[in-house]
Amino acid sequence: MSGLSQRQQRIYDYIKQFIRTNGYAPAIRDIQRELSISSTSVVAYNLRALESKGHIRREGNISRAIELINAEQPLPTVLGGQRVPVLGVIAAGQPIPVPNDSANSDDSVLVPEEIVGNDKLGDVYALRVKGYSMVDALIADGDIVLLRYQATAENGEMVAARIRDENEVTLKRIYWEGDRVRLQPANVTMEAMYYPSTNVEVQGRVVGVIRNLG
């Protein structure tokens, strides 16, 4: 691949092969260990170079969110781990009705422990994404997001937010702005949504994503 250093080419090739094998992107430490690179900061530097040269896209606040650009997305051949319940669909767009609870879920997804980092799989659930409001965060229609059960979130974190008076839920970045909440899409064509802070309930924070490669 022209314009890349030898190290950048090796990192790119490793990412592609890792996605083919596992169905999700490697963490920085995976790359460092496998390619015997001196430090994670060196890996991060080369990932920034790959991104600036237009070969990958990254979403910094989500574990393992690396996407190959202008390349055939490799299909996973192996995906091991434990099952996490898929509780329903979440809107990446306008809010939709709250998904069913886990007691009524007959759907699940096989998730490697590594994909959620330090989060225990028992504290994690999954939702299928409907819509395109988070495409600039590398989350597209048909992807599955993994969320950690929690009722609080910091500014800028991606969450499942329930609009209480409408009993609907949406996937957005959350920002607390005094007595109101801004739910911000990651799509330049869409506008933020604003609600009174008392009308918004955090139902989970996004900790990973499984891409729909079909």
Swiss-Prot record:
Question: Which top-level group of life is the source organism from?
Answer: Bacteria
Q: Does the keyword Transcription regulation apply?
A: yes
Q: What class of enzyme is it?
A: hydrolase
**Cleavage (site feature) positions:** A92, G93
Q: Per UniProt, which keywords does this protein have?
A: Autocatalytic cleavage, DNA damage, DNA repair, DNA replication, DNA-binding, Hydrolase, Repressor, SOS response, Transcription, Transcription regulation
Residues annotated as the enzyme's active site: S133 (for autocatalytic cleavage activity), K172 (for autocatalytic cleavage activity)
Give EC number(s), comma-separated. 3.4.21.88
* Catalytic reactions of this protein: Hydrolysis of Ala-|-Gly bond in repressor LexA
Note the Gene3D superfamilies from the entry: Umud Fragment, subunit A (2.10.109.10), Winged helix-like DNA-binding domain superfamily/Winged helix DNA-binding domain (1.10.10.10)
Q: Which GO terms describe its molecular function?
A: DNA binding; serine-type endopeptidase activity
Extract one GO BP annotation from the record.
Answer: negative regulation of DNA-templated transcription
Q: Enumerate the InterPro entries for this protein.
A: LexA, LexA-like, LexA/Signal_pep-like_sf, LexA_DNA-bd_dom, LexA_repressor, Peptidase_S24_LexA, Peptidase_S24_S26A/B/C, WH-like_DNA-bd_sf
Instruction: Provide the residue ranges listed under DNA-binding region in this record.
Output: 28-48
| Repressor in keyword set | yes
Q: What does this protein do?
A: Represses a number of genes involved in the response to DNA damage (SOS response), including recA and lexA. In the presence of single-stranded DNA, RecA interacts with LexA causing an autocatalytic cleavage which disrupts the DNA-binding part of LexA, leading to derepression of the SOS regulon and eventually DNA repair.
Subunit record text? Homodimer.
Q: Which family does it belong to?
A: Belongs to the peptidase S24 family.
- The name of this protein is LexA repressor
Q: State the organism named in the record.
A: Herpetosiphon aurantiacus (strain ATCC 23779 / DSM 785 / 114-95)
